UniProtKB/Swiss-Prot annotation:
Upper lineage: Bacteria, Bacillati, Actinomycetota, Actinomycetes, Mycobacteriales
Gene: nadK
Organism: Mycolicibacterium paratuberculosis (strain ATCC BAA-968 / K-10) (Mycobacterium paratuberculosis)
Protein name: NAD kinase
PANTHER family: NAD KINASE (PTHR20275:SF0)
Catalyzed chemical reaction(s): NAD(+) + ATP = ADP + NADP(+) + H(+)
Domain of life per record: Bacteria
Amino acid sequence: MTPAERTVLMVVHTGREEATETARRVQKVLGDNGIALRVLSAEAVDRGPLHLAPDDMRAMGVEIEVVDADPLAARGCELVLVLGGDGTFLRAAELARNADIPVLGVNLGRIGFLAEAEAEAIDKVLEHVVARDYRVENRMTLDVVVRHQGTVSDHGWALNEVSLEKGPRLGVLGVVVEIDGRPVSAFGCDGVLVSTPTGSTAYAFSAGGPVLWPDLEAILVVPNNAHALFGRPMVTSPAATIAIEIEADGHDALVFCDGRREMLIPAGSRIEVKRCDTAVKWARLDSAPFTDRLVRKFRLPVTGWRGN
């Protein structure tokens, strides 16, 4: 079998009922069009629940490669195709970002705000993939650095949000929020979220933050259950640096990047968040306005709208 000139990495939420059927459809259509498929080892038949049967596919002339889910799993691919919900998309976005390629989501979840299409439209999605008929948007990401006792103790990045949270079963977390080197407010809270416009419809929204349109360049700061008169969300410049200092005599805390990558934050630490130089490349098929997506995904009532 001649090696394919094109390869797509498929990342799948194997806990979804329709995952196997949809994945097999992807496998067949890409194979019929001479595009090799790469899958993660945890999702392959011999080591995972997806039952993709790589050996059977190879025997039928379909090129499929099984790789470990390391940070460079998407290197050499042209696209990361996601079958799952927003959690699966965020997991796949990390692989796409590391390889500097686009990520395209097909929703198998409940809301799937980050997905471009639903599972029933998989054939149409694959037509676009085969023809490379999609546009690519650069979505802003955040860089986070943790400093403790004057030295960098940890660092990370996020597409949706950086979430500082108090530890389990601990009391109120005492923090001071600083923007561009100037203190804004000190308060007790359950945590503080720093979000991109992309993440404004996720955890930050649940914590009371506003929805930011994705073409707006800004950073959103949302105190979570703040014990303060001034505990309101703030929208800052995309060039701003947001710092959150934890009381030295207070509790340890945790930072989660996109709800996945976790950092332990000792009391007295300082968390600095700013715009990251490296964006996530987002493959777009849907030309509808963001307003329509918002209404559709959140099932917002629009009865009575008269228009022009």
